[in-house]
Amino acid sequence: MNFYKKKPVVIFLMGPTACGKSQLAICLRKYLSIELISVDSALIYRGMDIGTDKPSFSDLYNHPHRLLNIKDPVENYSAAEFQKDVLREIDEIIKLGKIPCLVGGSMFYYNVLLHGLSILPPSNIKLREYLIQKSYEKNYLYKKLKLIDPISASRIHKNDFQRLIRALEIFYLSGKSLTELKKKNNYKLPYNIFQFAIIPPNKEWLNNKIELRIKKMLMLGFQKEVEILFLRGDLHKNLPSIRCIGYRQMWEYLEYKNSYKDMFNKIIHATRKLAKHQLTWLKNWKNINKIEYHSTSTILAKKVLDVLEKNDFSV
C-alpha cells in the first residue's frame, strides 16, 4: 500500500478489554505493511502471561509485538519511560518503511503519547516514602487528589497507587496540579494518526465476555502462574505488576485473605470496572473512528481499511 502523502502514518487500535484488539491487529497484517507495538501496562511484564491474556507463543512468533515482556515484575515502568520507548519504536518502524500499529487498552499511555508529559519535578524520596505510608489508609491518596486535582482523580483508579502518589508528589513539589502543568504543554506528534476503537454491542455482552475470559484464564493455570510469582520472595502486592487485575486478587487468595469464590468474583468485578473506565475514556476521545464489534476479525479489518481508503490510502 502507499503511505499517506505528507506525514508518516501511525495506527492506534483501542477498545475495552476482551473486545478482540490483538486479533484485529494480527488480521490487519494480511493487508497492511505494519509492525505491532503493545500499549498495555500489564503486558510489559515477563512471566505474567495467562492473567494478562498475552497473545499465544505462536501468534507472537509470527506477529511480534514490541514493548511486550520488557520488564521483570519487580521493576517499575513509568509513563515517561513508555513515552520514550514507544517514540523510539515508532521511529524505527518508520525507518523500515512500515507503518507502526499500536494495539492495547492502556488509555493513559495513549494519552501520554498524544499529549505528552509536562516538565515535571523529579521524585523526592522522603515525600514518596511518606505518601507510600499514607497509601495504607483506605482511599486516602484518592480523596486527597480529588480535593487538589479532581480532573486527574477522575482519570486514575483509586487503587492505582503509583499514579496517585506521582500526581500528589507533583503538586506538593511544584505547587501546581498535574492538570495545570499539562495545559502549558505545546507537545505535538509529527505523525498522521488514525485512531480506531472497537466498541462492544452492549454492556451485557461485554460482561459475559469478561466472565468467559476469566473462567478460561483459571482453566489455563492462572493460579499456578501467580504461585510462582508469590514464591519468589521479592514481590509484594503493592508493586504495580502485582496490582494488575487478577494478580492482586489471586495474591490475596494465596495469602488466605479470601475464598476461591470471592477471588473469582473480585476479578470479574475489577475487570468490569476497568472496561467501564476504558469506555469512559473513549466516549470523550477526540478524532476517533469507532467500529462496532464483530466476532470475525476480517470484517473488523475491512472497516479499518475502508476508513484508511477514504483518507488517500490505496490498499
Swiss-Prot record:
GO MF terms, alphabetically ordered: ATP binding; tRNA dimethylallyltransferase activity
Primary gene name: miaA
Superkingdom assignment: Bacteria
Reaction catalysed by this enzyme: adenosine(37) in tRNA + dimethylallyl diphosphate = N(6)-dimethylallyladenosine(37) in tRNA + diphosphate
Residues binding ATP, per UniProt: G15, P16, T17, A18, C19, G20, K21, S22
Protein keywords: ATP-binding, Magnesium, Nucleotide-binding, Transferase, tRNA processing
Keyword hit for tRNA processing: yes
Entry-linked PANTHER family: TRNA DIMETHYLALLYLTRANSFERASE
GO BP, sorted A to Z: tRNA modification
Role played: Catalyzes the transfer of a dimethylallyl group onto the adenine at position 37 in tRNAs that read codons beginning with uridine, leading to the formation of N6-(dimethylallyl)adenosine (i(6)A).
Quaternary state and interactors: Monomer.
Name under which the protein is recorded: tRNA dimethylallyltransferase
Sites where the protein binds substrate: T17, A18, C19, G20, K21, S22
Cofactors (names): Mg(2+)
